[in-house]
Amino acid sequence: MIIIVQHKVRDYDAWKAVFDEHQAVRKQHGATGHELYRGLQDPNEITAVNHFPSKEQAEAFAADPSLKEAMERGGVISEPRITWAQETEAVGYKA
């Protein structure tokens, strides 16, 4: 189960520091990892992919009040776009 969150931030470095501080909360809810992506045209456009073992754990994390506070403190300036997804295939290609 993954949660894909896209939003714009005021300043990537300031946002990233808060994102890193919030890792303990993600782990507390069972998160097993994440990936971060920055927009090519706008490096303050962030896509965060968070991995959870179950939908219930992902939902509990999304409902945690500290998440909204962290997003505000990190300088999120747009309404987040959230996609919930279940992995169906992951394939790596060798050069």
Feature locations, PLM:
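Generic ordered-secondary-structure signal
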Residues: A17-D20, A24-K27, G39, V49-N50, ...
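Short, well-ordered beta-strand segments in beta-rich or mixed alpha/beta enzyme
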Residues: I2-K8, E35-D64, A85
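Short linear motifs at secondary-structure transitions and domain/linker junctions
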Residues: K8-Y12, H22-Q28, E56-F61, E89
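Short amphipathic alpha-helical segments
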Residues: D11-G33, S66-M71
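Glycine-rich beta-strand-turn "strand-cap" elements at beta-sheet edges
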Residues: H29-E45, E69-A95
